Design a protein with these regions (language model features):
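Hydrophobic/aromatic side chains embedded in well-ordered alpha-helices
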Residues: 1-3, 88-89
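Alpha-helical substrate-recognition element adjacent to the catalytic core
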Residues: 2-78, 147-148
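C-terminal cap/substrate-recognition subdomain and adjoining C-terminal extension
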Residues: 50-148
């Protein structure tokens, strides 16, 4: 099963006036049903998901939090790319990445696995997960999701 690495801020939660992002519940259902999901967030860089679940419990109902317990932790220190198995088949969903992280992806021929979320488009999160499920990475994705 393809891996899906997830950030929280800017993906599942909005970055301003924090709340659940538009489409987040549908996104979570689709992601958990179709991918092996991993947290790739500053809230869980030590391999412990407790802080993530506690944070998300402020914005999502208990049944969603129970489902989110299936998302696996990652460990990384400086760059999020340290927490990604770059040899695996994966997507990385985030709203912002550092240039150094893009360079790691480029060096490993994985830049196309990065998908940036645009919270200014209320349908963006659900549209992107549906596209990932239906199309995979068989070519260029139909949106400007990173800078090459």
């Amino acid at each position: 099963m393809k891996k899906l690495y997830l950030d929280i801020d800017g993906v599942l939660l909005t970055t301003k006036n924090t709340r659940a992002a538009d489409g987040a519940v549908e996104f979570i259902d689709l992601a958990l049903s179709n991918f092996e999901c991993y947290w790739l967030t500053t809230h869980c860089k030590d391999g412990n998901c407790n802080q993530v679940l506690k944070l998300l419990a402020q914005y999502f109902p208990n049944d969603i939090i129970e489902r989110l317990k299936r998302v696996k932790p990652t460990k990384w220190d400086t760059l999020k790319t340290e927490g990604i198995d770059l040899r695996s088949d994966f997507y990385w969903l985030d709203y912002f990445v550092f240039e150094a992280e893009k360079q790691v992806l480029k060096k490993n021929l994985r830049l196309d696995n990065l998908i940036l979320v645009d919270q200014n488009n209320k349908d963006d999160l659900v549209l992107k997960i549906k596209y990932m499920i239906n199309q995979g990475l068989n070519g260029v994705l139909p949106w400007d999701y990173h800078m090459k």
